[in-house]
Each structure stands twice: as C-alpha cells, then as structure tokens.
C-alpha cells in the first residue's frame, strides 16, 4: 500500500510530525536547502537582460536527493511541509525541482506550530506553492551573490585578503563604525550637581534656583555651583507642594523575533544566535507531559498577531489562576509597526498552556527552560490587565532653592504578576504641606558627560529593525558574519569594530555608498516584500541593481587606491633571512616576512615614536618574558595576541608549537615535573600545575 510522503527541512521536525500521524504517512527531512548556487563560480547566467540562477544540488545532499526521488516516485501523494516564510517556500520549490515534480501541482501545507491538531488541520487545507514568495527569496539570494562575488574580491585586492561585503552586513557594519566614530570624537563636558539628603535618608533633587529651572546639565560652572551650594545651606526647609499621580502601565506585546532576541539578551544573557538555536528546538519538538511536540510557535516572525483560540485559552487560564481582576474586559490586540511585517504569521507564543514552566522544568534543559519561561510568561502577560502605580513628588524649598523628593509604589501588580521589572517601591512618609524637614547631608559633586555607548548585539538588532534593514531570519546571521570575519569583536557584550572595519566602511562609503546606506538597504527590503506580494517584478529589480553596481565595480578597479603598501623595516627575518615589513591586518598593524606564505614569521608591532627606529633584537625583547620554552628548551616564551585575546607561545614558532593561555613560570611541579603556570585570581596570584591541578602561592 502506497504511503503519503511529507517533506520537511529538519530531522527533529520530521520526527515530531511523524509521531502525530499514522502508518499512512512517512515524514522525511531535506536537511535544509538541497539546491544552491555553486561555490566555485558566479552561478548567474545573464541572457537578454534575464537573470537565470544556475542552481546545483549541493554535494552533501546527492544521496538524499536520490532517496527523495525514489520515495516520491512510489508515494501516493507528496506534501511540501517546509516553514511558512520565504526561505521555507524556496526550500519547497527546490525540493520539487530536485525530485523532478511540477512545483505548481504538489500540495503545500503550512502551520505556525507543530502540534497534532495543527498538522491535521494543515493536511485538510493544502495550498499551492507561492511562487511570488519564492521569487522574493531568489532575488535576495541573487543580490547577495552579486554583491559578495563581485565586491568581496575587490576589497581583497585593495585592502587585504579574506574580506567580504554584503547588502545587510555592510550596512550593519557602518552603523557600528559610525557609533565608534561618535565615541572617539566625543568631548566630555563637566557639570555639577547639588545632592541633598533630608532626614530620614530621603534623597532629593535640585529642581529650581532663584525661580530658574535646574536640569541635569544646567550647572556647568564650578563657581556658580558653589554659589548655589551656599544658598542651600539655609537649614530651614518646608514642604511647598505635594503631587500624586496614578499611572496605568500597559502590558508588553507578545514576542516577535527581534524583541525575543533583545529580551533574551537583556534578561538571560543569550546572544541572538543562541536564542534562535534554542527557539528552533522548542519549535521543532521536545519531550513534554503529553508526548513529543513543538512547544512554541514559529520563531522567525515579525508579526504580533495571535490566533483567536490561543487568546481565548490564555484568558481562561488567567481567570482560573489569577482571578478576574487580572483579566481585562476585552482581549488585548496588538499590531506591529515593523516595516514589511508579514501579518499572516503569528507572534511567538507557547502552543500548550498546560505545559507550564513548572512542568517544563522536568523535561527541558536549563537554557531551554529559561527561554521557554520567558516566552510563556510574556504571552500570558500580553493578555493581562495593566499594572497601576502611584508616583509622588514632594517639593521642599527655602528662600532661594526648591528640591524634589520622589516616591513610587505599586497599587496593583497586574501583568507584573508574571512578567515585568518590579522595581522596589520607594514609599514616602505621610507628608503635609508646610511641614519642616531637616537636612541630613548636603554636598556638591562634579560629573562628566559620557559618550554614547557601543551597540550590544540586542541593541544592534533593535537598530536594524527600526531602520528596516534585514528581516527576522537575518538578524542573528548578520552579527555572526561580522564577528567571524573579524570586522567586530565582542567585549563585555559591546560590539567593537576592528581597524579593517573602518577601512572597509570608508572604501564602501566613497565608492559604493548604496551598499552601506541604511535607506537604500531598507528600500531594497521593501522591494523584496513587494515581490512577495506580486507588486514588483523580480527580474526588473535585479536589472536595476546589477548594471549600475557593475559600473561601480569597474570604476573601483582603477579608482580605489590600494591600501596594501608595505613599510620595509630594513631587518632580516630570523626564520628565513627574508625582509621584514609592517603590514595591515584585521587587528591593526603587525610585522611580517615578505616571503609569506612560504615563511609564516610574524610578531606584534609595539607602539613606537615616529622618529624612533628600533632594531630587531629590541622589538623581539619587547614581547619576550625571559622564560625558556618548557617544550623545546631553546626558544623564549613570548606574549602574543589573537582575536580571542592574549596567549603565550614559543619564539621558535613554527618549529616549536608550544602554546599556553597562562604565562609559564620557571618552576616545575614537584609531583609530575610539568612547568607551573601563573594564574592571577581575586584571592591573589598563584602557581598552578595544569596537569595535577596543584596550586601554590607565588612568592614575591
């Protein structure tokens, strides 16, 4: 008896769906894209202004395609069940092509969640493949190939090898570089504050002096600050006014991709890549108290829509578990402000409210539980009543100055019951107008304005979203590309551009301004949305981009000056005798042998005076530790740097491959004879054997 064949992307998804269906169905995974543009060539044929992608079955999918063809041939019906977004639609298209079926006749089934009811409903309501969505994805893929294949080699030729450029990544990189320029150009401004504490421990803010309003940056002159301080020393203060306001704090909307990534970063410390990997697992299926199922809806979405049934279930759950006060009279409805949002999709929510975080703790690992709990509570919160807070401002004055004491308390916690930043209440005493207050402490303090902060990964995602750059599926990969290409390093959650990031951005700004222009990139994203909606032609879009872009590429070959000039040091390489020179790398300048790649000798370039030229021995000594290499007993242990930070290696590299994260000492372990390394801890500096783990205090 013939079976129905369902083809999905991932094995995990296939396994979960297979558990829901009977013996009449077989579910198999394509394991992602089975066709793509070739890696070894441009892969786009241009004939009579038509752009024809030359797709190939990827080498790691050859055997799988044979299996799919065989199973499809014998199947009663073949269902394409890839994700419901452009990428999923394109994967379905390529599957149909690869197995030799007409993409217009195969039934396409879609669902927002992987639950039994959702799959059964999808099978009852198949549709045709949406070729407009496929063409939007093809346009994006071809645009990325054009930019990457034509522009990246030019950057490699003019700046350094291994560089890349892309529509979204280059625009994102410019945002990071521009922020770094702001920070470097920032000039701090000194300002002063008059800080008052009234009895008992009541912090007060100066808001008025001689009838003039005082704000944060009002007092920038020290003499004036002293004058105001003197006026504040009058110890007779009385309450002149009391303001009290109630405020409703509306619950936040449910998560979409960008806000999930931001909240997971801020609350859980997860980077976007980690968030999406965990969310994918939760979507595709995990063990639950009711068997294997997807426990959240599709995680790549820019929609805030919620299924009517899901909202009704949430309202029942809220009333049953929290009471009627926590349930608004009508369901809360949210609409997205994101450019190009696909409203047919759903927001990210739990698929089964009975799978509570308490029950989930028995089935999910630590990080899965954290993210699931965040999604679960946010969904419940979005359908709960607002929180109500009361703010109180008490104004205290003498003859010349007015201070403000602020207080706050939560009158009703509302959605804060499950989700929210519950700041500690600052409840003020019962004051009366005319009441006198005594000064507990009064002082003048100096401050300096601070430069704008660098973007965090979550902050960059928020910025990209606000500018309409990229879509839910591209945020995490964009950051991964920037870090893997060494354009950006992440230090204490801050994105820091490298020297080469400045060089590349400068070249692109001068010669390919469209590529780094956020408005152009956003408009192109909007055009892709229009293609998906059949409001724009994909071939025309490619044509309008390609020809002006290629003219700039040709101009750039002669117009862009090479930055690969080297400064010879007049020194001989200690390894091969060749000439040493200063080269530019991803992390700045360094010394290298001109016989590269035959000779791999290199070292750090220490900051030197422009009028000072040091000889080779002096420079080598600057990196040296004076400790003999414990491995070869010939070389010297030297301090080196990589993109992961400082490490210690042998000066005889590459002949000696000794490497250590910690600085080796001259002492040996009494137990095994291994070299002890120096570890600096909060408790002090110790010597430790990495083999025996024996520690001993380091003597001065």
From Swiss-Prot:
Enzyme class: isomerase
Example of a GO biological process term: DNA topological change
Entry keyword Magnesium: yes
Domain Topo IA-type catalytic: 130-553
One Pfam family matching this protein: Topoisom_bac
Chain segments carrying region Interaction with DNA: 164-169
Matching InterPro entries: Topo_IA, Topo_IA_2, Topo_IA_AS, Topo_IA_cen, Topo_IA_cen_sub1, Topo_IA_cen_sub2, Topo_IA_cen_sub3, Topo_IA_core_domain
Cofactor (UniProt): Mg(2+)
Gene Ontology molecular-function annotations: DNA binding; DNA topoisomerase type I (single strand cut, ATP-independent) activity; zinc ion binding
Gene3D superfamilies: 3.40.50.140, Bacterial Topoisomerase I, domain 1, Topoisomerase I, domain 2, Topoisomerase I, domain 3, Topoisomerase I, domain 4
Binding annotation for Mg(2+): 9, 83
GO cellular component, one term: chromosome
E.C. number: 5.6.2.1
Protein purpose: Releases the supercoiling and torsional tension of DNA, which is introduced during the DNA replication and transcription, by transiently cleaving and rejoining one strand of the DNA duplex. Introduces a single-strand break via transesterification at a target site in duplex DNA. The scissile phosphodiester is attacked by the catalytic tyrosine of the enzyme, resulting in the formation of a DNA-(5'-phosphotyrosyl)-enzyme intermediate and the expulsion of a 3'-OH DNA strand. The free DNA strand then undergoes passage around the unbroken strand, thus removing DNA supercoils.
Family under the similarity heading: Belongs to the type IA topoisomerase family.
Protein name (record): DNA topoisomerase 1
Gene name of the record: topA
């Amino acid at each position: 008896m013939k079976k129905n064949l369902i083809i999905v992307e991932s094995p995990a998804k296939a396994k979960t769906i297979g558990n829901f269906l009977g013996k009449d169905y077989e579910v198999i995974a394509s394991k992602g894209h089975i066709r793509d543009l070739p890696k070894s060539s441009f892969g786009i044929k241009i004939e009579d202004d038509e752009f024809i992608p030359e797709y190939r079955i990827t080498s790691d999918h050859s055997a799988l395609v044979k299996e799919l063809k065989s199973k499809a041939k014998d199947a009663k019906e073949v269902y394409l069940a890839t994700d419901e977004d452009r990428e999923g639609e394109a994967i379905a298209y390529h599957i149909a092509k690869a197995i030799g079926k007409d993409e217009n006749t195969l039934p396409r089934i879609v669902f927002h969640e992987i639950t039994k009811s959702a799959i059964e409903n999808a099978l009852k309501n198949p549709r045709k493949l949406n070729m407009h969505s496929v063409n939007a994805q093809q346009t994006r893929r071809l645009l990325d190939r054009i930019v990457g294949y034509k522009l990246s080699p030019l950057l490699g030729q003019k700046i350094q090898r291994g560089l890349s450029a892309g529509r979204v990544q280059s625009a994102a990189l410019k945002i990071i570089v521009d922020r770094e320029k702001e920070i470097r150009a920032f000039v701090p401004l000194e300002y002063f504050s008059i800080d008052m504490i009234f009895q008992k421990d009541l912090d007060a803010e100066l808001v008025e002096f001689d009838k003039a309003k005082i704000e944060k940056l009002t007092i920038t002159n020290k003499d004036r600050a002293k004058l105001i301080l003197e006026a504040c020393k009058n110890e007779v203060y009385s309450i002149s006014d009391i303001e009290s306001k109630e405020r409703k704090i509306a619950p936040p909307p449910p998560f979409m991709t960008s806000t999930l990534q931001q909240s997971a970063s801020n609350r859980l410390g997860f980077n976007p890549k980690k968030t999406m990997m965990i969310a994918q697992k939760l979507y595709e299926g995990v063990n639950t108290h009711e068997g294997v199922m997807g426990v959240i809806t599709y995680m790549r979405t820019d929609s805030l829509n919620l299924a009517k049934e899901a909202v009704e279930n949430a309202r029942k759950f809220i009333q049953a578990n929290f009471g009627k006060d926590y349930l608004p009279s009508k369901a809360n409805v949210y609409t997205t402000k994101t450019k190009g949002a696909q409203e047919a999709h759903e927001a990210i929510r739990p698929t089964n409210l009975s799978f509570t975080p308490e029950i989930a703790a028995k089935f999910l690992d630590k990080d899965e539980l954290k993210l699931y709990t965040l999604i679960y509570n946010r969904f419940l919160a979005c359908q709960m009543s607002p929180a109500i807070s009361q703010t109180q401002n008490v104004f205290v004055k003498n003859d010349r100055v007015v201070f403000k004491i602020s207080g706050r308390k939560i009158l009703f916690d509302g959605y804060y019951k499950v989700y929210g930043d519950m700041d500690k209440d600052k409840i003020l005493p019962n004051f009366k107008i005319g009441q006198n207050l005594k000064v507990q402490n009064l002082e003048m303090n100096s401050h300096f304005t601070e430069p704008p902060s660098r973007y965090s990964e979550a902050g960059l995602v928020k910025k990209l979203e606000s500018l309409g750059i990229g879509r839910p599926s591209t945020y995490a990969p964009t950051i991964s590309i920037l870090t893997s290409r060494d354009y950006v390093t992440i230090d204490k959650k801050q994105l820091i551009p490298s020297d080469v990031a400045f060089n590349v951005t400068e070249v692109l700004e001068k010669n390919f301004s469209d590529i780094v222009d956020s408005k152009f990139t956003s408009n192109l994203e909007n055009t892709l949305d229009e293609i998906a909606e059949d409001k724009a032609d994909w071939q025309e879009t490619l044509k309008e981009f390609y020809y002006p872009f290629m003219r700039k590429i040709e101009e750039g070959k002669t117009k862009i000056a090479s930055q690969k000039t080297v400064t010879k040091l007049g020194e001989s390489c200690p390894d091969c005798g060749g000439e040493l020179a200063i080269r530019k790398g991803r992390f700045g300048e360094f010394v290298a042998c001109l016989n590269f790649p035959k000779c791999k000798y290199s070292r750090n370039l220490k900051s030197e005076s422009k009028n000072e030229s040091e000889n080779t021995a002096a420079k080598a000594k600057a990196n040296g530790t004076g400790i003999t290499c414990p491995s070869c007993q010939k070389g010297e242990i030297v301090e080196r740097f990589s993109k992961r930070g400082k490490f210690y290696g042998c000066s005889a590299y590459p002949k000696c491959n000794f490497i250590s994260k910690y600085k080796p000492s001259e002492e040996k372990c009494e137990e095994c004879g291994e070299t002890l390394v120096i570890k600096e801890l909060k408790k002090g500096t110790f010597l430790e054997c990495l083999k025996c783990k024996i520690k001993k205090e380091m003597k001065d």
